[in-house]
């Protein structure tokens, strides 16, 4: 009987880590995937505390350690990482990692790409732009990343309605609900399809 080991994934995050925590818990039984590492570029980001509470190793690194050295690459190799999940990660992934993990780096964007994507379009900036434009719907896009911001292949989208009176804050809450509900499952389905 062939026993397959779980697929190792790493989460890159820059903030509080609610999506990271949700992903870690979703794959907690380790039957398909195992979050083996959380990587963060901000020393005061709460995501590292969430990882600690869930017994997942976390490492803080600098922008230059990501861009100009093999430090991050070595951490990923040591853990046998096969897929990288970007969960609120605000730095651009260098080309060498894009090549090494070709079509195996997944991001979530808080809008329905191709609208409201690109450099500088993250978090509240996105929600403010959507409300200012008078859009009637928004949502999330889970996508594979490539060398251009928010241009990679779309894996999954989910929508929400924007009501009269919605603000960037109320829209952010709706988007967060979609992220919590759908992001882990979209990751699972993509990995099942591509592994």
Across the structure, where does each feature detected by a protein language model lie?
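One-carbon transfer enzymes
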Residues: 1-195
């Amino acid at each position: 009987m062939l026993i397959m080991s779980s697929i190792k994934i790493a989460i890159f995050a820059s903030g509080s880590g609610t999506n990271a925590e949700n992903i870690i818990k979703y794959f907690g039984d380790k039957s398909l995937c195992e979050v083996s590492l959380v990587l963060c570029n901000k020393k005061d980001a709460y995501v590292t505390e969430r990882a600690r509470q869930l017994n997942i190793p976390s490492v803080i690194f600098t922008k230059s350690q990501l861009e100009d050295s093999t430090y991050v690459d070595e951490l990923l190799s040591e853990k046998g990482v096969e897929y990288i999940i970007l969960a609120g990660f605000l730095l651009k992934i260098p080309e060498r990692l894009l090549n090494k993990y070709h079509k195996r780096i997944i991001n979530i964007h808080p809008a329905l790409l191709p609208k409201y994507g690109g450099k500088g379009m993250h978090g509240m900036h996105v929600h403010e732009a959507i409300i200012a434009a008078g859009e009637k719907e928004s949502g999330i896009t889970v996508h594979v990343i490539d060398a251009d911001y928010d241009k990679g292949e779309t894996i999954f989208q989910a929508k929400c309605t924007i009501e009269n009176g919605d603000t960037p804050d109320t829209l952010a809450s709706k988007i967060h609900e979609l992220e919590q509900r759908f992001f882990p499952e979209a990751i699972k389905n993509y990995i099942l399809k591509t592994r």
